[in-house]
């Protein structure tokens, strides 16, 4: 499946809060559908629960199914808890770091800034949103949109990053831990979903 370009609030209503997908808050707190909220309680199958957790991750970080499967396979080969390593790889992507630094309102916007060449890493222009940032790298931008967004959307910056709002620069201090990830997701269910692939 290619990149999702459809209605984003509909996804938020179905899956719950996804801070990387949109800044909008839905008016109704039940899933979208023709006949409104269902009156009967339907039991969710185990497959559906795992699929929804996987979809949360995909939509929040804006990755395709193929990319996510590649991240899962790479996390399996590494030493350590597979679920935490998967989340760490997704969180250390350049577009995610730009979003976490407060330079963009969503990960989608951060992805666009990166692909348009508005972000530099250690003084080099990087146009690949999936670039894996490592400890000690400095992310900088002099582009007007990013400088404005850093003043507007600057929320709480995670402790693994440091930011200088005046110069629109940020630095990766250390690798992200599970407690610093802002998305509510059960990574073990995602690993179980991909266990047959």
Question: Where in this protein do the model-derived segments appear?
Answer:
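Glycine- and Gly-Pro-enriched alpha-helical subdomains that act as flexible
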Residues: 117-120, 125-127
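Ferredoxin-like alpha/beta domains used as RNA- or RNAP-binding modules
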Residues: 1-101, 128-197
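Short, well-ordered loop/turn sites that connect or cap secondary structure elements
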Residues: 113-114, 133
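Beta-rich strand-turn-strand
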Residues: 104-107
């Amino acid at each position: 499946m290619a990149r999702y370009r459809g209605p984003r609030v509909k996804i938020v209503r179905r899956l719950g809060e996804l801070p990387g997908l949109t800044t909008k808050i839905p008016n109704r707190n039940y899933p979208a559908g023709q006949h409104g909220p269902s009156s009967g309680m339907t039991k969710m199958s185990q497959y559906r629960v795992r699929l929804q957790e996987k979809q949360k991750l995909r939509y929040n970080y804006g990755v395709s199914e193929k990319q996510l499967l590649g991240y899962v396979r790479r996390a399996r080969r590494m030493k350590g808890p597979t679920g935490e390593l998967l989340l760490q790889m997704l969180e250390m992507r350049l577009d995610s770091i730009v979003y976490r630094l407060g330079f963009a309102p969503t990960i989608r916007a951060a992805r666009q800034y990166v692909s348009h060449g508005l972000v530099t890493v250690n003084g080099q222009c990087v146009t690949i949103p999936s670039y894996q940032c490592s400890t000690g790298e400095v992310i900088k931008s002099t582009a007007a949109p990013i400088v404005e967004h850093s003043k507007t959307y600057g929320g709480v910056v995670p402790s693994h990053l440091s930011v200088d709002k005046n110069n629109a620069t940020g630095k990766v201090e250390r690798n992200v831990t599970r407690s610093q990830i802002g998305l509510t997701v059960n990574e073990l269910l995602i690993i179980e979903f991909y266990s047959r692939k």
